[in-house]
Structures are given as C-alpha cells and as structure tokens.
Swiss-Prot record:
Zn(2+) binds at H175, H177, D188. One of its GO terms (molecular function) is metal ion binding. The keyword Zinc applies. It comes from Delftia acidovorans (strain DSM 14801 / SPH-1). Belongs to the UPF0758 family. Residues 104-226 form the MPN domain. PANTHER family: DNA REPAIR PROTEIN RADC, UPF0758 PROTEIN YEES-RELATED. This is UPF0758 protein Daci_1904. InterPro entries: MPN, RadC_JAB, RuvA_2-like, UPF0758, UPF0758_CS, UPF0758_N. It comes from the Bacteria. The keyword Metal-binding applies. A motif (JAMM motif) lies at residues 175-188.
Amino acid sequence: MALKDLPAQAQPREKLAARGPSALSDIELLAIVLRTGMAGKGVLQLAQELLQLPGRAGLSGLLQAGHADLKAIKGLGPSKCAQLLAVLELARRAMAEQLRERPALASPEAVARYLQLHLAARQHEVFAVLFLDGQHRLIALEEMFRGTLTRTSVYPREVVLRALHHHAGAVILAHNHPSGQVQASAADKAVTQNLQAALRLVDIQVLDHVIVAPGASLSMAGQGML
C-alpha cells in the first residue's frame, strides 16, 4: 500500500509522534529517513528494497552497505544516498563509542552487536580482532584473515604483531559463520588455543572469542570454552 493511502494515524511520522520510535517497523523508520519515493515506487517500497540488498539483507546488512550498494537501488539519488550513508556511519560510530568509553566485558551484548554489525552479513568467513587497552576499552577492530578458519589460515605471529602495534593489553577474537550456525567447531577451539598461547608470551590476554551470524552470536568465554 502506498503511503498516501494509509490512514493518517498509521503513517510513519504520525505513528512515531503518537507512540514513539519503538512502535515502528524497520521499514517505517527507514521511510521517515528517506521521506519520499519516486514515480511508480513509494517510499515504503524503497525502504523495503534497502532491507533486501543482495547479500546484505536486513538492518545488519544495510549497516555494512557502501555507496555502490545504495546507488544500485532505483530511486536513490545522490542526495538520498549521502543522507543514508551519513546515518549509517553515525550508527557505526555510536556502537564503537560505547566500547571505547567503558570496558568491553561490562557489556558483552554491546560487543556482540558491534561484531554483528561488522561481520554477520558477510558471505565469506572473516576473522577479526578487537584490540583493547589495559582497561579493556576498544582501541581498534581489524580484519586479519579471510577464508575457512583453520590452524594454518590464522597466523598467531601476525595477531601478536598487531597487538603490540596497538599496545593492547587484551584482545577479543571474532569471526562469522556465513552458514548462520554459531556453534564453535573443533577448528575454532584449536585456533583460539593457539592464539592464547602466542599472546600469553607477550602478556596479552584473550578475553573471548565471539562467533556471529545474522541474528545470532556465541561467546566462547560465556560457554566456558576459554
């Protein structure tokens, strides 16, 4: 249904004013940001297409979208693209700010959300490391390796060198499972143990290894696997 055909109280802006933003769907919130559609494509349809980007479905996928992804959507001109990219970047910065201002372990949920934002929608496996200071606040997130996780695909020396470069006091390991399943495999456990041993030599603690997928995450520390 086109936006103009909805009853006034059901239109996104009026609904938000009356009931608050949490009462709106993702599509409705996006429609407010976009404001208008185009001839033959209403703003609600445009918002729906943004949540169905090829290989980047849902909000987590949209948060990883770049300029080229948005340009491919018919009806998104330069102005709307710039507006959306600015909103998405602000969302990413807000999540990173939470981890920089307080210890990561004080909010494991924030860590999981942050990692899902960066990794969950990837179609290939990515291994990343959160480098933390002595108070366990975020210094940086770096993607280290791509491909199926095995002992031979993750080089402990490279992780140690990057940790020393950042003067990290601790790290959180992370990778995604494109399959959508977040169970830790034998390879995941072996890689974690190898990195723990290597980082222990330079007095850097591995606080956790988080596995993420769209809508799901697993903390190996939380499961008693570290």
